[in-house]
Amino acid sequence: MVKHLIAMADNSKLLVLLFVILIVSLFGYDVKAESDKAAEQAALRVANEWLQLVDNTKYDESWNSAAEFFKSAVVRDSWRQTLQAFRSPLGKIISRKVKSKKFTTSLPEAPDGQYVVIQYEASFENKKSAIETVTPMLDKDGKWRVSGYYIK
């Protein structure tokens, strides 16, 4: 009797496993898509924190917290001067909303890696409509940091 119950339990486990496999194959659970979404969320958090530095004219701090790739391409003084020339005249941020975000592993003129390109619809005191693009990347130490910023 005990052997019969064990055999039934093993069959039940097998049926449950087969059912799970069937459901997963029917609905196509995509592990990569889930990891891309997690990366997008982590990158979005970092981008928002970084934008607060820029919004508060903490340009040196924004450079300090940027990705190594960014810092090797732009010296701190140049970064500060560029933001003072182009970002400061826009005035205070009025509103900012995520327009799109996309995970990618390659970008033009950048090393292969993990990036999330985030576009924001923004409104400033002196520019009612702008698109800000912030590109965090997974840095060598495993932390997300901003590697690019562009205002259009």
What name fits each language-model region?
Residues 100-152:
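Exposed beta-sheet edge and beta->alpha loop/turn motif
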Residues 5, 25-28:
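Alpha-helical hydrophobic membrane-insertion segments
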Residues 34-37, 48-51, 66-71, 121-123:
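Second-shell loop/turn segments in exported
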Residues 44-45, 60-113:
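Short solvent-exposed beta->alpha transition segments
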Residues 27-58:
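Short, low-complexity N-terminal intrinsically disordered segments enriched in polar/charged residues
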Residues 17-26:
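Bacterial N-terminal signal peptides
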Residues 2-17:
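Bacterial N-terminal signal peptides that target proteins for export
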